[in-house]
Curated annotation (Swiss-Prot):
The gene is Ighg2a. PANTHER family: TAPASIN. Pfam families: C1-set. Disulfide bonds join C26-C81, C143-C203, C249-C307. It comes from the Eukaryota. It is found in: Cell membrane. The chain crosses the membrane at residues 345-362. Residues 5-97, 120-219, 228-324 form the Ig-like domain. Its main location: membrane. Keywords: Cell membrane, Disulfide bond, Glycoprotein, Immunoglobulin domain, Membrane, Repeat, Transmembrane, Transmembrane helix. SMART domains: IGc1. This is Immunoglobulin heavy constant gamma 2A. Glycans are attached at N179.
Length: 398
């Protein structure tokens, strides 16, 4: 149900301030749904502004913002909190007025910052997909509490698995230098099968600055499972003139989108690779690319590179595609081999032609010689046959 917000200006309680700066606040309470926009002086005042994340309580949101200005700026100049809630078409402008008469305060009086509702914010993060799907690794669910005041650093964090409290989490506190607040990180080791079976993990946080404990829950999303198709692609020929070349791993047709891709070189993990985020395809599945930059000489020397993919749809949740430079891919070598082959074929053709030519010449000469000899023999015989016998003719005449 749409509910318009109530807006409350927050001012220091001591009248005039003795310090060089003063912090003012604006509380936006009891609205639904999100979002609201909050600006100071219609956006012209942006320096020193800190807007806290919205907090959901009893199905209504509460948001607060503070702005720090110099004592000479306020209250001598007007400062207004501008709130807009599009869902309810609400716009509210609240001018920050001094509380009480502006009298000279007692010397010990020091104005505290307004007690803004919001305080710490809580976030929960799932385990890394590789840690969940590889039995040799340990998955961890993480709860992070930010913007914890140094004045109230005590944060109580409780963990529940399917609403059963567990006590195996490890919690550490870190100081944030950029805004002088504390960050509390609680890590809960979990069982692989608990996450894969869809159990619910809940982080419950309490602190003095919180009006009520904040709970955050997380579990494995439900949905269809489809194993990815993995393809590895060598560098394009146009890139072989450069010092570095690109190897590509294309992963397609997988569901859900949680996936882990890495590269190895002869069994050693490579670091110089980049993965795209999974992209939703038209059929509801996902695809992604991973590229690895390597030195060309390493590729030319035929080092073996592998693209490893971890996904719940795969057999044993893991597959690896390996490849290296294939012999004979060098264009110069291919051309040289082709040229040598063409020359060999040409010499063979020439040799056969010459042999056949010489054989033909020899055959023609032999046939011609035989014919000449036969004709000559025939002429001689014929001449002997028809020659007159002069001796008989002389004898008859006598």
């Amino acid at each position: 149900k749409t509910t318009a917000p109530s807006v409350y200006p927050l001012a220091p309680v001591c009248g005039d301030t003795t310090g060089s700066s003063v912090t003012l606040g604006c509380l936006v309470k009891g609205y639904f749904p999100e979002p609201v926009t909050l600006t100071w002086n219609s956006g012209s005042l942006s320096s020193g502004v800190h807007t806290f994340p919205a907090v959901l309580q009893s199905d209504l949101y509460t948001l607060s913002s503070s702005v720090t200005v110099t004592s000479s700026t306020w209250p001598s100049q007007s400062i207004t909190c501008n709130v807009a809630h599009p869902a309810s078409s609400t716009k509210v402008d609240k001018k920050i007025e001094p509380r009480g008469p502006t009298i000279k305060p007692c010397p010990p009086c020091k104005c505290p910052a307004p007690n803004l509702l919001g305080g710490p914010s809580v976030f929960i993060f799932p385990p890394k997909i590789k840690d969940v799907l590889m039995i040799s690794l340990s998955p961890i669910v993480t709860c992070v509490v930010v913007d914890v005041s140094e004045d109230d650093p005590d944060v109580q964090i409780s963990w529940f698995v399917n609403n059963v409290e567990v006590h195996t989490a490890q919690t550490q506190t870190h100081r944030e230098d950029y805004n002088s607040t504390l960050r509390v990180v609680s890590a809960l080791p979990i069982q692989h099968q608990d996450w894969m079976s869809g159990k619910e993990f809940k982080c419950k946080v309490n602190n003095k600055d919180l009006p009520a404990p904040i709970e955050r829950t997380i579990s494995k999303p439900k949905g269809s499972v489809r194993a990815p198709q993995v393809y590895v692609l060598p560098p394009p020929e146009e890139e072989m003139t450069k010092k570095q070349v690109t190897l590509t791993c294309m992963v397609t047709d997988f569901m859900p989108e949680d996936i882990y891709v890495e590269w190895t070189n002869n069994g050693k993990t490579e670091l110089n690779y980049k993965n795209t985020e999974p992209v939703l395809d038209s059929d509801g599945s996902y695809f992604m690319y991973s590229k690895l930059r390597v030195e060309k000489k390493n590729w030319v020397e035929r080092n073996s590179y592998s693209c490893s993919v971890v996904h719940e749809g795969l057999h044993n949740h893991h597959t690896t595609k390996s490849f290296s430079r294939t012999p004979g891919l060098d264009l110069d070598d291919v051309c040289a081999e082709a040229q040598d082959g063409e020359l060999d074929g040409l010499w063979t053709t020439i040799t056969i032609f010459i042999s056949l030519f010489l054989l033909s010449v020899c055959y023609s000469a032999s046939v011609t010689l035989f014919k000449v000899k036969w004709i000559f023999s025939s002429v001689v015989e014929l001449k002997q046959t028809i020659s007159p016998d002069y001796r008989n003719m002389i004898g008859q005449g006598a």
